[in-house]
């Protein structure tokens, strides 16, 4: 492939992605939706006769090149997700937040698995190996959480540091970690990424060994980074070395331990998240990612998967998938919060707060498509899930606090009236 063949499609994708992304931010929906919409628009070029048609045809050199950019993009997305992890907060996590996290991962996963079995296969008994792991992976996709919308809403309401706010933020951090581990284990057990299915215990052992090796290497890396930081404070050398560590972890995870490359990237971010310059590293790596690789990943979801109208079975399953994914978090997190002695209102708020999804759900789904575990037909419904959850979450959260706000306003009005009466008496 001549390298220049990818340059024109790349330029088109970057410009259209940025425009669509900004439009989505302006109207209050996640930027990733705009990036995917840009990919859908660009993918239509394949069907329009003209000089651009060959660039976006299936199997074209340009699409192959874009695929490589997309894979780097997904690694950087997960690296930044790992950098967002607050390790100190994890250490201070209480039992309720831990239980809520585990329920928030496994309840949606089990419900998703059951729904997939019943709708796609009509039964949960006598499934083949491939059917079992395909259905299980649909459940795994439901485990992902993105609380950026929730955090913004709670901040607006002045409730971010409340019991609900602290629980949601902490549970979301743990949710990411547990979800990524589950993803790696399921892909490894399925045998879809390069060979025969492995014994579950072997997969778990490899995953544990990877985490041990990663944190040992990470400990050494932190020492080196600290020395670099002392001699070159706020220098670009630090983010460059950080991204290099991310790529090394992603490679080692996939090649040496048989763990998903995105897990390696995520752990690299976690390892560096406690670095005093973590925010600086994250800003720089995000700039690098969102300048080129990340928009290509989201646009490539639409271009490579060739979205088309689903058949009736897929339509029914897709809509059920969205509903189960939404309710799974509310039931799993909200129900468990209730068992942990949270009030009914606070339990509902925790469930709603954990309901939102974003780019990590797309990353997990694309990993399943690439591994041959699931069909690309599910992707439009994951996009629908992101849109619906991003719009519904702030509405329901604000509604749940409406009565509290009324009581505060009434109490404030009563105090003002009392003060006014005292002034008149004087």
Residue ranges of model-derived segments:
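Transmembrane helical cores of multi-pass secondary ion antiporters/exchangers
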Residues: 1-426
């Amino acid at each position: 492939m001549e390298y220049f063949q990818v340059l024109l499609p790349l330029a088109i994708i970057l410009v259209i992605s940025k425009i669509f992304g900004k439009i989505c931010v302006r109207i209050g929906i996640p930027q990733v939706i705009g990036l995917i919409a840009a990919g859908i628009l660009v993918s239509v070029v394949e069907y329009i006769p003209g000089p651009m048609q060959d660039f976006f045809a299936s199997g074209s050199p340009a699409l192959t090149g874009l695929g490589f950019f997309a894979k780097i993009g997904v690694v950087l997305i997960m690296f930044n997700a790992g950098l967002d992890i607050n390790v100190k907060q994890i250490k201070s996590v209480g039992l309720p937040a831990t239980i809520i996290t585990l329920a928030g991962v496994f309840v949606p996963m089990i419900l998703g698995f059951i729904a997939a079995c019943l709708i796609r296969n009509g039964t949960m008994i006598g499934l083949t190996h491939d059917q079992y792991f395909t259905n299980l992976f649909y459940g795994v996709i439901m485990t992902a959480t993105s609380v950026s919308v929730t955090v913004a809403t709670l901040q607006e309401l002045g409730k971010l540091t409340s019991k609900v706010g602290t629980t949601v933020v902490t549970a979301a951090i743990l949710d990411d970690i547990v979800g990524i581990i589950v993803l790696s284990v399921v892909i490894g057990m399925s045998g879809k990424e390069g060979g025969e299915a492995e014994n579950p215990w072997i997969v778990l052992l490899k995953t544990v060994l990877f985490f041990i090796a990663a944190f040992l290497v990470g400990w050494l890396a932190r020492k080196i980074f600290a020395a670099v930081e002392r001699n070159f404070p706020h220098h670009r050398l630090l983010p460059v070395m950080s991204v290099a560590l991310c790529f090394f972890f992603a490679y080692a995870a996939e090649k040496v331990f048989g763990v998903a490359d995105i897990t390696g990237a995520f752990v690299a971010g976690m390892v560096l998240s406690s670095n005093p310059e973590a925010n600086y590293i994250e800003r720089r790596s995000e700039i690098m990612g969102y300048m080129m690789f990340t928009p290509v990943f989201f646009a490539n979801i639409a271009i490579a998967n060739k979205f088309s109208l689903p058949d009736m079975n897929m339509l029914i399953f897709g809509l059920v998938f969205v509903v189960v994914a939404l309710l799974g978090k509310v039931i799993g997190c909200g129900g468990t919060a209730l068992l942990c002695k949270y009030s009914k209102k606070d339990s509902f708020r925790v469930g709603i707060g954990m309901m939102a999804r974003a780019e990590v759900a797309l990353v997990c789904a694309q990993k399943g498509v690439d591994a041959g575990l699931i069909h690309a037909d599910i992707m439009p419904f994951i996009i629908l899930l992101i849109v619906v959850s991003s719009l519904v979450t702030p509405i329901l959260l604000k509604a749940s606090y409406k009565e509290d706000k009324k009581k505060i306003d009434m109490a404030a009005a009563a105090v003002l009236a009392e003060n006014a009466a005292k002034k008149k008496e004087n």
